[in-house]
Amino acid sequence: MTVKGCLCLAFGVTLIVIVGVVVAMGVALSKGRAPGDDLVTLALNELAGDEDVVGRLSDAGAANLTGLLRGLILDHLSRNSSGLVAADALYERVLTRLRLDIFVFNGLVAAFNGFWLSFIIMYTCARTVRSGKKVAPAPIHSPPTMMSPYI
């Protein structure tokens, strides 16, 4: 393999690393949230501070907890929907910004890792080419099977 081959190999590995991370982050970025998840979380946070709600929850016990929570949340949402809708819009903007920041950060990390990986490949390959050794892949040996005479 020549130095040109080493450069092509390093460039290919770098490109594969960066494209893989971009595709993975693009999929993660495009996934939306379930509708109303943050509204329920906000309602639960507001309900946790209410002594009446805490008392009703402790009286109910664990058996009817899910149904009681659902009823309390729906009741709370029906009474305080305007503030929660505004908070939901703010939450959505913050979440979108955070996803974008994570995407950019991971893209920079992928570029950095791709650079160092290509540098290691180029350095190792160039040393081998310079020393005059052949750079060739190792021969592929099939694993022994039941029909193999070596078993």
From Swiss-Prot:
GO cellular component: membrane
Keywords: Membrane, Transmembrane, Transmembrane helix
Parts of the chain that traverse the membrane: 7-23, 107-123
Subcellular location: Membrane
Signal peptide, first to last residue: none
Keyword Transmembrane helix: yes
Topological type in the membrane: Multi-pass membrane protein
Domain of life: Viruses
Residue ranges that the Swiss-Prot or TrEMBL entry lists as coiled coil: none
Designated name of the protein: Putative membrane protein ORF10
Originating species: Ictalurid herpesvirus 1 (strain Auburn)
Phylogenetic classification of the source organism: Viruses, Duplodnaviria, Heunggongvirae, Peploviricota, Herviviricetes
